[in-house]
């Protein structure tokens, strides 16, 4: 059934959970030096910028997942299939390119870029669906 009032309500609630997650990830980033010390001691030095980049990826990926869950629930997965296939083709060359110049941060940056592309398309798609303005590829 197409209960858009209920779906909008769920989307809003899930968005609040996402905001809480952003706060939790941010707190974890600031606590990371202490947590790393407890977890692995002085065996490995993890750069703070690496922690921040992983946190950024986590936040982007969680936002992306929120959109995808609802899109999958509605069954409008054609656009998702195309966008993810393009992302898969672009991810490895982009990771290799950025990894060559920036190292491990380049690979994480590549993941962030690809997931930002996903998130952009999927956020537009779910908002079109929930506002009942989706047509063409946006609703298939």
Predicted regions and their residues:
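Specific pore-lining/lateral-gate transmembrane helices of multi-pass inner-membrane transport
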Residues: 1-42, 46, 55, 63, ...
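Short runs within selected transmembrane alpha-helices of multi-pass transporters and secretion channels
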Residues: 25-26, 30, 49-75, 79-99, ...
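Interhelical loop/hinge segments that connect adjacent transmembrane helices in multipass membrane
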Residues: 2-5, 128-140
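Membrane-interfacial segments
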Residues: 35, 39-43, 102, 106, ...
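Serine/threonine-rich low-complexity intrinsically disordered regions
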Residues: 1, 45-47, 102, 125, ...
